[in-house]
Amino acid sequence: MGNIVNNVGADGGLPEVTTETSGTPKQIYRNTDGMSFFPVLIVAVNLDTTTIQKMILVDADLTDSGEDDNKGEDKAVFRFTVAPEDTTILTEKDLAGLVFRYGIGAYNSTSKSSGSGVVIYVAGEEK
């Protein structure tokens, strides 16, 4: 068994995906070097009151050279939507077989200002 990890920041905060609609995703989680991340839970909260937001997840670590080669939206490994003022919960059953080699980057289908995007919590196992 590997390490159980999540993406809660040292300050208790979670990343919000807002304007990431071009070539650089929002970093949601960075793997420990040399380990892969197997998500078992993703909780996404849409803070906007009117817009369905589609999340596009890619396998990338934006801070390490060579680990961001697959950061483009066209390299999506998983997609899901979140209704306005709603929460999408994806469990181990939904995420079965999904593995991130470098980390999780996320794009938003629409450009939103801070406070109107999608906040994403991820938990899983690194091994």
Label each residue range with its predicted role.
Residues M1-G34, L47, R101, N108-K127:
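C-terminal interaction-tip segments
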